[in-house]
Amino acid sequence: MYHVIAATTNPAKINAIKLAFEQVFGKDTFDIEDINVDSRVPQQPIGNTETRTGARQRVMAARQVRPEADFWVGVEAGIEDDMTFAWIVIEHEQIRGESRSASLMLPEQILKGVREGRELGDEMAFLTKIDNIKQKGGAIGYFTDGLLSRTSVYQQAIVLALVPVTHDIYKQLNKKDDE
C-alpha cells in the first residue's frame, strides 16, 4: 500500500488527491496523510512562477517531514493576470511530475481585492457570503454553478502530474538518463 503525503490540510485539495489516486491506482491501494507545511510563498501567490514554486516547496518540505512516504503531493493555487489556477507537483522516488490546472477568469471586483493584498478565498467568501468557500467548491464551483469545483479541476491536473511516475515511456527515458 502506497503512503501518500498531501502537503496541505485543505479538504478540497485532499479530496482531489484521493480521487486522482483512486483513478490511477485503484481504491484501497494507498493511504493519505495530510500535513501542514509552509510553501514559503505569499498566502496568495501571484504569477505562474511563484505559484509553481509554492507547490515545489510544499513537496520539498513534506519530504523532509515524512521521508519514508512513497508519494509527496503539493497543490498551490495562484492568480496570474485575471485567471486563477493551480500547480500540482508530485514526487515519487526520484521522479517528479508537474501539471497546471485549468484556469478560471475572475471578475474585476474580486481581482481588485487580490491586488490590495487579500486572498481569493477571502474575497469570494465576502462576495458570496459562503464561509470558508475555498475549502468547498471555491470560485470554480461558485462561478460554474457546481458544474466544476476546485476538487474536480485539481483532480484532472493531479492525474496528469502522475503520468511521469506511471507511464512506461517516462520510466524508460529516466533509466536511459541514469545510465
From Swiss-Prot:
InterPro entries: ITPase-like_fam, Non_canon_purine_NTPase, NTPase/PRRC1, YjjX_NTPase
Molecular function in Gene Ontology: ITPase activity; metal ion binding; nucleotide binding; ribonucleoside triphosphate phosphatase activity
Catalytic activity: XTP + H2O = XDP + phosphate + H(+); ITP + H2O = IDP + phosphate + H(+)
Keywords of the record: Hydrolase, Magnesium, Manganese, Metal-binding, Nucleotide metabolism, Nucleotide-binding
Binding positions for substrate per the UniProt entry: 8-13, 68-69
Cofactor dependence: Mg(2+); Mn(2+)
Record: residues binding Mg(2+): 38, 68
Comment on bound cofactor: Binds 1 divalent metal cation per subunit; can use either Mg(2+) or Mn(2+).
Enzyme class: hydrolase
E.C. numbers: 3.6.1.73
Top-rank lineage group of the source organism: Bacteria
Biological process, per Gene Ontology: nucleotide metabolic process; thiamine metabolic process
Quaternary structure (record): Homodimer.
Role this protein plays: Phosphatase that hydrolyzes non-canonical purine nucleotides such as XTP and ITP to their respective diphosphate derivatives. Probably excludes non-canonical purines from DNA/RNA precursor pool, thus preventing their incorporation into DNA/RNA and avoiding chromosomal lesions.
Homology family: Belongs to the YjjX NTPase family.
Name the record gives this protein: Inosine/xanthosine triphosphatase
